[in-house]
Amino acid sequence: MVSIVVEASNGFCSIACLENNKVLSQRNMECSNNLSAIILQEIDNCLNDAGKSKKDLTEIIASNGPGSYTAIRVVAAICKTLAYTLKLPLKVASSLKLQALLEFESNKLIVPLIDARRNNVFAAVYKVENKKLIEVLQEDYYSLEELNNFLKNNDEQFVYVGRDIKKLKEKLLLAENNKNEVSAANVVKIYDSLEIVDSYNMKPQYLRKTEAERELENDKNK
């Protein structure tokens, strides 16, 4: 079983090639402004690093959000196209869950988050039990106040993960050190929980409507 894993939900792209759930290669890079221009080449580069090619692939694994709308759409389009043209199964993984896996060995609550602007975040809270991620607070679109109140009212220690923590640190509760950059290779830790989706109908998990959709609704309600 040879897999390519693609994650690029928040200005950072991570691509990994796995064989029988073991990491053969991984490429990580900033991609805030050029994801669509580099992603196909970087997938090829990752496969080359692993000594593989597209014809060796047996499945595609895509991070399907939440995060940057543009990045999520690009990853979805590329992975759906690869799965369809190569006639391969497509699996999806939550970008927040992939972030949480950076602290998979932690005995604290794990709080992955992505800045959603205007004092809001995409976030979830997990804990690890029996080497499995257990959802304590479901992934969703929260105000920072809502997330902070949840953590305040919980007696357990916690740790944040995510590259937006520095930007939001003055608005977050005190927590211990955090890890920032998501790793596509970490999908091996939740591989058995991934489900195959219909590559034609696979939809990114935005968790909220785009600004254009919100403006259109506002115009209709005027």
Q: What are these language model-derived features?
A:
Residues 1-64:
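N-terminal beta-alpha supersecondary unit
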Residues 13, 65-69, 73, 117, ...:
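Gly/Ser/Thr-rich beta-alpha loop segments that engage phosphate groups in nucleotides
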Residues 30-38, 69-73, 77, 178-182:
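Residues at secondary-structure transition points
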Residues 175-222:
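Acyltransferase
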Residues 59-95:
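DPxDG-like acidic metal-binding loop motif
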